[in-house]
């Protein structure tokens, strides 16, 4: 009987921990990026995708519904200096329904991307509807052009004091966890000053969109 005691103890512990483990696995993160499409749209449904022939509007749509993107920089790491180097960056172009098209970021000098940007501020930001329910609901693979994604190149710049409050409000409404990140990391607000945009939303190659076309769009 004594030999079975450890076995019984392990079984009891497993039974007690199982519900907690399941809850952790199925519960979404409290931040917007941990859900199918966020905390701020109550019904969690995407608005309709703009007509695919309207590249500028599609680009603005993708930017506005994206919570994060892949930011590619030119690496300053000794072993891969001069090579492309990408990292995931949380973004926001404005409060829900009020997107400006400017992709704001909250960055720290401790991030490798920031070290790269200090030497060369040119970067490319990629955003995809794969982060929403759109592609999943339609059965589109993330690499498929039908799973709309955009690439925008430009220069990452620190926002000025006038723009800082808007950048803060835009980011914190979508990423509330940011408010509690350690101040010792010297966070600052930045944005991508866009020079060129590519929209991949159908077969046959990307549409090229200029910044003027992009910012002339009024979101409905």
From Swiss-Prot:
Which family is this protein grouped under? Belongs to the CREG family.
Q: Which InterPro entries match?
A: CREG, CREG_beta-barrel, Split_barrel_FMN-bd
What is the name attached to this protein's record? Answer: Protein CREG1
Q: Which GO terms describe its cellular component?
A: endosome; extracellular space; lysosome; transcription regulator complex
Sum up the protein's function in the record's words.
May contribute to the transcriptional control of cell growth and differentiation. Antagonizes transcriptional activation and cellular transformation by the adenovirus E1A protein. The transcriptional control activity of cell growth requires interaction with IGF2R.
- Region (Disordered) location: 30-53
The leader peptide range reads 1-31
Q: Cite the record's Basic and acidic residues compositional bias ranges.
A: 33-53
Subunit relationships? Homodimer. Interacts with IGF2R; the interaction is dependent on glycosylation.
């Amino acid at each position: 009987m004594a030999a079975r005691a450890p076995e019984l103890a392990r079984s009891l512990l497993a039974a007690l921990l199982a519900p907690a483990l399941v809850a952790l696995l199925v519960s979404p993160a409290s931040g917007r990026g941990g859900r199918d499409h966020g905390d701020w749209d109550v019904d969690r449904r995407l608005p309709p995708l703009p007509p695919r022939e309207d590249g500028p509007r599609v680009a603005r749509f993708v930017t506005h519904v994206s919570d994060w993107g892949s930011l590619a920089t030119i690496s300053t790491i000794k072993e891969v200096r001069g090579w492309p180097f990408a990292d995931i960056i949380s973004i926001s172009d404005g409060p829900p329904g009020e997107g400006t098209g400017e992709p704001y970021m909250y960055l720290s000098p401790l991030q490798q991307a920031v070290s790269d940007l200090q030497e060369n501020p040119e970067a490319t930001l990629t955003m995809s509807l794969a982060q929403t329910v759109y592609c999943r609901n339609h059965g589109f693979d993330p690499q498929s052009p039908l799973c709309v994604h955009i690439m925008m190149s430009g220069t990452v710049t620190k926002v000025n004091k006038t723009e800082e409050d808007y950048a803060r409000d835009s980011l914190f409404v979508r990423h509330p966890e940011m408010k509690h990140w350690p101040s010792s990391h010297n966070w600052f607000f930045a944005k991508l000053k866009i020079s060129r945009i590519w929209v991949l939303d159908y077969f046959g190659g990307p549409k090229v969109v200029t910044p003027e076309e992009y910012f002339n769009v009024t979101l409905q």
